[in-house]
């Protein structure tokens, strides 16, 4: 039975990421313990995606959340849960890789291989029917009735493969679908999860304007859209979302981060430690302070309770 309710809080300043690690039982056990420790000690936001670790991360989140709630340690409203969809995914516990999942599960439900655009091994789609399947599966994995936030995952892949106007039209259709999910109480808010735009803001193939996306979201919601968050890589080695004037709002050239803020979209920094690379020359304190100074929230991936203890000192 799915747990009812949703968070009564905004995303915590630091959220726990769940993308790292292999699909083994050992890693899953570490994640479950890490999630429970983090939530009980102030990092109450958990960032995930249906494709992380072949769905195992979401399933681990679901087990940890249920154990916390059923034991009375926390209530549903104390936890902020995030997921993402858009990339082709598999189900490792059912021994289905993404190709097999497409053929055996998605295609019988009307999803076609031609719905996806591909880049560097990642297949991405904006087809609302795919998101319907993915969202329902995420809610099942997480044992939840409502997600606090659901992201469109790496839409740059699709935008790079189609005409700009067609891309905005497809995003508008997807926004309309999302607004319907808010009405159905399946999500509270939605957002955009970027990969390449943050890393390579001057590369035209990854470019689209957030002002136009916000306009399209407002259009399908009578000006009351639930498009609220944008997540992108931001760290000392990738400062571009706050240094490169890559967006425009009311004719003014702005950085990605400043454009989001001007449009009323909350900014979330992913990979604040640059996958550990930045720790070679900078302290954890330097890196977290840099990311927190530049964005309203950050996501730090960890399955290690000792690492989480270090993070807690920055809350």
Which role does the model predict for each range below?
Residues 67-77, 142, 182-186, 220-225:
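Short helix-capping segments at alpha-helix termini
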Residues 79, 83-100:
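Short, solvent-exposed beta-strand-terminating loops
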Residues 14, 33-42:
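A short, Lys/Arg-enriched amphipathic alpha-helix followed by its capping loop at the start of a domain
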Residues 94-129:
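Active-site-adjacent "subsite" loops/lids of carbohydrate-active enzymes
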């Amino acid at each position: 039975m799915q747990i009812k309710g949703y968070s009564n809080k905004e995303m915590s300043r630091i959220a726990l990421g769940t993308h790292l690690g292999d699909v083994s039982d050992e890693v899953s056990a570490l994640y479950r313990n890490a999630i429970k420790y983090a939530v009980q000690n102030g990092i109450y936001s958990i960032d995930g995606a249906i494709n992380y670790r072949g769905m195992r991360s979401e399933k681990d989140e679901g087990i940890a959340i249920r154990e916390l709630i059923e034991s009375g340690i926390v209530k549903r409203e104390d936890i902020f849960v995030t997921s993402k969809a858009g990339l082709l995914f598999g189900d490792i516990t059912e021994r289905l890789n993404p190709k097999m999942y497409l053929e055996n599960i998605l295609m019988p439900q009307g999803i076609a291989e031609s719905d996806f655009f591909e880049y560097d091994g990642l297949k991405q789609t904006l087809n609302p029917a795919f998101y319907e399947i993915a969202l329902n599966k995420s809610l099942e994995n997480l044992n939840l009735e409502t997600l606090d936030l659901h992201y469109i995952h790496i839409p740059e892949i699709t935008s790079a493969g189609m005409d700009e106007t067609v891309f905005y039209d497809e995003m508008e259709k997807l926004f309309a679908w999302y607004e319907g999910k808010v009405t159905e109480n399946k999500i509270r808010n939605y957002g955009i999860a970027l990969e390449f735009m943050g890393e390579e803001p001057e590369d035209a193939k990854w470019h689209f304007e957030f002002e136009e996306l916000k306009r399209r979201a407002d259009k399908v919601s009578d000006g009351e859209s639930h498009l609220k968050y944008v997540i992108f890589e931001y760290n000392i080695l990738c400062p571009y979302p706050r240094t490169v004037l890559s967006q425009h709002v009311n004719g003014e050239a702005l950085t990605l981060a400043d454009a989001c803020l001007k449009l009323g979209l909350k900014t979330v920094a992913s990979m604040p430690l640059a996958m550990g690379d930045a720790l070679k020359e900078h302290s954890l304190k330097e890196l977290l302070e840099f990311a927190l100074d530049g964005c309203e929230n950050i996501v730090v991936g960890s399955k290690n309770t000792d690492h989480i203890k270090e993070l807690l000192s920055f809350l």
